[in-house]
């Protein structure tokens, strides 16, 4: 029987606590500094243990967190089999939740590894995206975050006006038009109002100007990303769907990554959290709750906005929405989720077929298509 060195790691910003064991032997507790030098020393020590055990294989497990996948990359590069586990799929008893320590967490991960090696139990692992996908996610998420900040600043401006009993003139219409911007700038310079109001409003307007410029830069970066060989064909196909823009397509592609890991529409729907919770026990076998909201929330947000755009246009999704709402007018949210699920499955089918095609993109045709998709005014999540 092959020998294994199994390591359960509780990872933190500055330290790592390891529980190291060989097969069924008792575990050894090791504390490591979470620095480059500390991790290099840890890898060397584990390799020395494996060599002393007659060339044993090393298995390493830690929970996914805000630390990212840097540790996974270092271990994999050193030839160590690393598993990144999903914290939400690791069952913990009530007693374990009451008494939580780093050592107990590392011990639990070690036991999961042991059960995997010795009994063949599956590990609740997460999919580890490649370095390029992670890098692409950063710019897409930055664009989403900037849009959220812009929306929050506009809400602050409205709140400031409301607190000071300043009503928007009806002649300015609705929305953040040039006329409305001009009126706000005039208020920020009007000496008839207090210094505090003018200073606060001027500060908020400067921040809005800055974020508007940033959104333009980020939109250009997204346009360039969408025209890259990795996403060109898929984005061109996806933006042809009603309600789906370049940003929505890129959020979908970068957050989901390898689309072939989903075998069918049920798996993609469950991963995105647009399926209902289930409460079945005994004769009560048809109790459904709210959606699970598992998976990337960013994808659900853009799907929701795209779904509302599709509902406003004639088509099968509008008919599906109206069919549910007609039965019960209170089920508008349920109908929206149904449209979101239909759209997600359709996007998955299209993107999977596009990414599996051997032929490369056609930059000339693609550029004009995407430029048209991005020509509309910036939307928070469009």
Language-model features: locations:
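A short, charged helix-loop
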Residues: 111-138, 180-192
